[in-house]
């Protein structure tokens, strides 16, 4: 089973993916996580990504993104492992590259309004140890500024600051909205209301998967 979750930053792709992977024996493929892992390396690819200023909200070019994503996806296909794609593809060129070697079974579009996006993104804080995600509006830690799991001090990523969020959403509108139009003609395209709580978004998708196996 090969699933794509598509939607703007803050629509809940990562959180929904985590819930789905726990209950459906799926692997979570997040280009964001892949890039963060690469940035910890001392490699030419890491240096190229750093030069792009990802923390400032800019997207990594298609050529590099396709290379990183294909490496991860090829390995899963080789091992016949079901997976969820989160954050890839984001552009028409990326989608066309993916279609060369991967036939998606489900394409879930997380539809959400701009006001809710800003609330979610600018209120998001993360744990540096376990990568746990909190939000000051609807998913607060038990102790302000402290992770529930390991008591590490939470931090806000640079790309979750208001200025960077605005840049990310502008980039999304420019590059990813055409991608949604591309996928809308696909019979495997399913629109999900992502303005509702993450748990309800997950339930909608999980129920759809159960009913359409």
Curated annotation (Swiss-Prot):
This protein's source sits in the domain of life called Bacteria
Q: What reactions does this protein catalyze?
A: AMP + ATP = 2 ADP
Biological processes, Gene Ontology terms:
AMP salvage
The EC number(s) this enzyme carries: 2.7.4.3
Give any Pfam family that matches.
Answer: ADK
Q: Which residues bind Zn(2+)?
A: 127, 130, 147, 150
Sites where the protein binds ATP: 10-15, 124, 133-134, 196
From the UniProt record, give the pathway where this protein acts: Purine metabolism; AMP biosynthesis via salvage pathway; AMP from ADP: step 1/1
Q: What is its main location?
A: cytoplasm
Q: Where is this region: NMP?
A: 30-60
User: Does the keyword Lyase belong to this entry?
Assistant: no
Instruction: Output the Gene Ontology cellular-component terms.
Output: cytoplasm
Chain positions covered by the region annotation LID: 123-160
Q: Which CDD domains match?
A: ADK
Q: Where in the cell is it found?
A: Cytoplasm
Q: Does the keyword Kinase apply?
A: yes
Q: Kindly list the GO molecular function terms attached to this UniProt entry.
A: adenylate kinase activity; ATP binding; zinc ion binding
Alphabetic keyword roster: ATP-binding, Cytoplasm, Kinase, Metal-binding, Nucleotide biosynthesis, Nucleotide-binding, Transferase, Zinc
Which residues make up the binding site for AMP? 31, 36, 58-60, 87-90, 94, 157, 168
Q: What is this protein's function?
A: Catalyzes the reversible transfer of the terminal phosphate group between ATP and AMP. Plays an important role in cellular energy homeostasis and in adenine nucleotide metabolism.
NCBIfam families in alphabetical order? adk (TIGR01351)
Write out the domain note.
Consists of three domains, a large central CORE domain and two small peripheral domains, NMPbind and LID, which undergo movements during catalysis. The LID domain closes over the site of phosphoryl transfer upon ATP binding. Assembling and dissambling the active center during each catalytic cycle provides an effective means to prevent ATP hydrolysis. Some bacteria have evolved a zinc-coordinating structure that stabilizes the LID domain.
* Self-association and partners: Monomer.
Q: Which family does it belong to?
A: Belongs to the adenylate kinase family.
Name of the protein in question: Adenylate kinase
